[in-house]
Amino acid sequence: MTTRRLTRQHLLANTLGNNDENHPSNHIARAKSSLHSSENSLVNGKKATVSSTNVPKKRHALDDVSNFHNKEGVPLASKNTNVRHTTASVSTRRALEEKSIIPATDDEPASKKRRQPSVFNSSVPSLPQHLSTKSHSVSTHGVDAFHKDQATIPKKLKKDVDERVVSKDIPKLHRDSVESPESQDWDDLDAEDWADPLMVSEYVVDIFEYLNELEIETMPSPTYMDRQKELAWKMRGILTDWLIEVHSRFRLLPETLFLAVNIIDRFLSLRVCSLNKLQLVGIAALFIASKYEEVMCPSVQNFVYMADGGYDEEEILQAERYILRVLEFNLAYPNPMNFLRRISKADFYDIQTRTVAKYLVEIGLLDHKLLPYPPSQQCAAAMYLAREMLGRGPWNRNLVHYSGYEEYQLISVVKKMINYLQKPVQHEAFFKKYASKKFMKASLFVRDWIKKNSIPLGDDADEDYTFHKQKRIQHDMKDEEW
């Protein structure tokens, strides 16, 4: 007995026959053998629809955001679907004509032209009775009634609406700056970015005011090493230099390195740490910062490998939990790179000045004498010294405005940086990092400039000018040793 050919209609009929209200009822007189054969064919039909291409495979890195998986599909012409391609219907042609960029011309037949929608559609639902008002009711008598209602609008209201329409393309912040340019001695460089939503020029002033307040709250104690029993400032520099090397090996973002060192300093400002756990604090801090800043964070096994087996995974994870509890999970640190990018706007994003300034800013990670200064002041001093080295001109009013510091407020920080650069190389990884071609050999250039132009500077601790000295918060260190 030959099996009856199973078609798509039979499959749908057998699967939906009992639940489909529009499907005709089956005849009861159908033979049991025919019923069994149709059920067997249905099972076989289900098996035939399963494709081997649905077996899960290893996902490629960009499968979810690219068309890579379309390359493995079978071409449309090679599929034997037994479907007859008919001509497009009128509704399909009309939909294609609506998607076309080129509008229909007058020479085309009337049947191909798109019908214009009516202004007042009867299918629009009306407002409820308790929400509708007589003075603002929508006219339903056509275009004439619409113009009649418009004529009743007061002239003063029309004038206000016209003024808002004319000035809606210019944000209020920049309109005020354009109206009174004589009241400021700096250029509004944010006005040209108002059309870029990524620059958020409407809120940039408020954002950096908030960051200036936040940087004071997240500053570590500049004297926390006095409470440490087994540690010294030299050990902090060695640990930071090793973290710079690990950071370069993993090719992490610069924000990750700054946040990691800030986590270390804030933790040591609150807890006493032993010498054998200092490296563990550094590894856990870099691990936390990687999770906070990076898109692809290195795994904990990578940090175990970089520690050369000194600590296992459980110790690193336990240190991570303990550090986060001590810091109360507060990782909102205003990164120095944010302030450096802001100042670079007034420098017209000069790549050489910015690269040298990045090298000078990272001195604050290694030299503990720069801890009393907030990140914004360190970045302004780094940009000031970089421009001086490259001969980019004086500290003008644009730089004063976008950095927030006058020239006299940066002299003490510049002296600290020059004092560090005049000494022999103490941190090899830091010096080699900026001696590479990637960073334009900035460390070699700075060292040559220091030898030729700088004069020996002593310890000027008594001449420090810390802009936020009166606002610094107090750190209550506990005697609990970890």
Swiss-Prot record:
Q: Does the keyword Cell cycle apply?
A: yes
Q: Is Nucleotide-binding one of the keywords UniProt gives this record?
A: no
**In its UniProt entry, what is this protein called?**
G2/mitotic-specific cyclin cdc13
Record localization: Nucleus; Cytoplasm, Cytoskeleton, Microtubule organizing center, Spindle pole body
Compositionally skewed regions (Polar residues) per UniProt: 35-55, 78-92, 118-140
Q: Which SUPFAM superfamilies match?
A: Cyclin-like
Describe the task this protein carries out. Answer: Essential for the control of the cell cycle at the G2/M (mitosis) transition. Interacts with the cdc2 protein kinase to form MPF. G2/M cyclins accumulate steadily during G2 and are abruptly destroyed at mitosis. Involved in the reorganization of the cytoskeleton on transition from G2 to mitosis. Association with rum1 promotes its proteolysis during G1. Also essential for initiation of meiosis II.
Fetch the InterPro entries from UniProt: Cyclin, Cyclin-like_dom, Cyclin-like_sf, Cyclin_A/B-like, Cyclin_C-dom, Cyclin_N, Cyclins_cyclin-box
